Structures are given as structure tokens and as C-alpha cells.
Amino acid sequence: MAVASKKFTERQFLFFVVNYIAGFGFISTALSLFELGPLSWVIFFLVSLISLIVTLAFARVSAIDKNNYGGAYLWAKKAFNSERYSHRLFIFFTGWNNFIASPLYAAIAPLFILSAFKGIDGIQGNAANTWILIAAGFTFYLLLAFLSTKGTSLNKKLIAVFASIKWAVLLSTLIVALIVIGKNGNGYAINNDIKQGPFKEREITLGAVATVFITFFYSYSGAEDISTMTPDVKTTNFRKILIISFIAVFLFYFVGILIFNGLLNVSQSDDDKGKDGRIASVADIFRLAGGLGALIFYGVGALFNNVSTRLSTIIANSRKILPLAQDNYLPTTFSKANSKGEFQNAIWFTFGTTIITMTVLFFVPLITSNFDFDKSTEYASSIGSAATLVQYILVFFIIFRLIYKKEQLYQKNWTRELEQILFGIGVFIILLMLLFYLFPVIDGKTKWQLKNTLTLVVYGVLILIGFALFMTQEYKRNKQKESYVTPRAVT
């Protein structure tokens, strides 16, 4: 593993973490909470609790090796014996699942941008113009993904510019929401009615609760990436940075949910979206408050934020499979660099995986939801979050394994006991939510839909691709071992 020079002070990295986690993931999923009426607050605090537990876990395990990159994969190598097949399988799956989470999130950005511009007159309700918007948005993000394979990177000044635009839009969203609430303040009463939604009786099932939980968890995702950056930070207390950043993000989200709770939300109805003060998406907030000009301001701001992240996404994610290839869990061709020092094979593999996944998760939800951009964005958020939550469970088990091996993770026994209880609670709740999300029919009320099949198929296929590559390397590994065995002499 490469050893890095320190690039961030504590304060710089604290701002970096808050900016990395808090953002459009929150405003693209926050309104989905109000499908559950007053239970939205229960889900918000439950998601925040699990996020805090995850933060504590990553903060604890990040102290294992502060000087090398690798993240959860590196920790799994230290916790398990790579000479045993079952342990190698766990180590590989930890690294591979971390890789495939990014392609599963790939459709969110284009869907989110399209949902921002769909409110322009002449688009919504017009099939031809809708398809033009879809084609333009998808092609644009396809081009961004291609450009990101060229090693494009953003310097600190440019990142600061994009961050400034992003936060200007985020804060404007809260201010504009207050203006809309002032015009029509019925949202607080309707959104907190357990029985009646905006237009019909609420249908709250365990499947619906799990879906909203996992969808909203997207707004807190990022700890798995941040924890791999310990070599870049000049600090002796990485744990403090993560906890302070969580508190900052939580407070921002709490204020945001408190404000959004006053909006007349129509997430349960397909009729009259965006009319008469009824809010189906954040784009509707701007359109109702300031018309086309405000809507364009929001759309352009969201676009700038997405461009800044998408330009480096392929390169960043390709780095996740490098250690797997270097350790012979994946074909070594992925670890080969060209004359310019770029790992082109890993980059193009990541590009192909991302584009195929983005295409499927972009078009299928749109078509099956009758081109409901908001619902499609929420679905795209949920499937990526599901893979991320699986990653968190793997990290919890890594910590349990390290404790079993009596690794020096804790200085005080009470801290170890308390965190073990919290991590156990985290595993239980995440497993429960994943179970009802992946198999919602087990609650006896939710009907199986095409999107449920799509989730299992897409995630399952990506896992099978990884296992096929892993088994190929295992076969080569065993063949190589056999070649080293000296044959017995014939007498």
C-alpha cells in the first residue's frame, strides 16, 4: 500500500468531511420521509442513530493503520487469515462490495438533475420533450463519465468554488422553503397526521418503512470513503474529526427536516404534483417561490455540484480494485500501469461497469414509474444505499473479529463494552431494514414490484461478476501452488 504525504490540517479536513457528506443527497431524499407521516421523525432519528454508530465504528477501526490507504479491505486483511479460503472470500467480498456501491449510485446524478428541470413549462406532460430531456441528460452524464477516465482532477481552488455554489443552493433551498410555507402552511398538520396523507389514507407497511429508511440513508453515506483518507490528514485524533463532522451534518439535517416538514408534500400521489403549493420535489419549492428563474438557479447549482463530483468518480472508484488486483484477488491486469502511470485497465473496467449499471438503473425505473423522475431518483438512491449498508455490516464484523483476536483497539474496557453493544444494535437494525427492503412481501401487505426484482438482479449480477473473477484467480493460485510441489522421485 502506498504511503501518502499529509495534505489536510485538522480544520481543513473537518470542513472537507462536512462538505463531502452533507449536500444534495439530503435534499434529493428528505421529502421521501413524509410518506410515513409523523413516523418520518422516528425514521430520521433512527437513521441518524445508525449513522452515528457507523461513524464510531469507522473512527475506531481507522486507527489500525493511519499511514496506508485501503479502508475496509485493509482492515479485513488484518482481521482475517488470508491463508484460509473462507477468510480470503470474506476479505475479497469486503473490497469488492466497496467497489460496486459506486456503480449502483451512478444513476442518481442524471435522474436528480432531470427532476430539477422537469418543471419547466412544455416538458412535464409532453412525451416528446420529456424524451429530449432524458436523452440530453443521459448523454451529458455519459460524456462526463468518459471524460473522468482521462484522469481529470480538480484543484483545491476549483473544489472550493464548486462547494461555494453548492452551499449557496443548499441554504437557498431552506430559505425558499420558508417562503413557500409562509404562503401555504398546511404541511405541518398534514405531514404529521398518522392516518390521512395529502389526498388519501396512508398505507404504512414495514416494507415502506424499510424503503424510506434505506433511501434516506443515502444522505449520510460517505464514511466508508472518508475513513480511507487517514494518511492525508495531519492529526492525532481522526476520531474527533469524524464525530464533530457527524454532529455538524446532523444539526444541518435536523433544521432542514424541521423546515421541510411544513411543506405540503404529495409524495404519495401522482396527481397535481407541484400545483397549488403541493410539493413533489425540491425543484417544486423553487418553482413555486420564484417561477422559472428560481428553478433554473436551483437546476444550475445542482448541475455544478454533480459535475464537480462526476469528473473524478471513475478514477477514484478504480482505485478501490487496485489493492484487490495487487493481492491477487482480482486479475493482475487491473494493477498494470501504462507509460503515464495510469491504471487504464482498472479505469476502463470501472467505466464499463458504471455505464452498464447506470443505463439499467436509469431507464428501467423511469419507464416503469411512468417517467416519475422523483420516484426514480429515490429508487436509485435506495439501491446504492443498500450496498453501502451491507458494507457497514462487514465493517462491524471486522471489528468484532479484531476484538476476538484481542487487538489493541481500546484502552478502556467500558468503552469496548459500550461500543460492542452499539455495534450489535447497528447490525440488527440494518439487517432488519435490508430484509424488508429486499423482500418487502414478508410483511404480508406490500406487493412485489418490478423494482424489487431489479434490485436483486442488478446487485446479484455485480456480486457474481466479482466472484467469477475471484474464482478465476483462485484457480490460477492453486495451479501455481501445484507447480511449486516437487514430484516424488520414481524408484
UniProtKB/Swiss-Prot annotation:
GO CC annotation, single? plasma membrane
Q: Where are the transmembrane segments?
A: 13-33, 39-59, 89-109, 127-147, 161-181, 203-223, 241-261, 288-308, 347-367, 380-400, 422-442, 452-472
Q: Which family does it belong to?
A: To M.genitalium MG226.
Annotated protein name in UniProt:
Uncharacterized protein MG225 homolog
**Which superkingdom, per the lineage?**
Bacteria
Alphabetic keyword roster: Cell membrane, Membrane, Transmembrane, Transmembrane helix
Tell me if Cell membrane is a UniProt keyword of this record: yes
Q: How does it sit in the membrane?
A: Multi-pass membrane protein
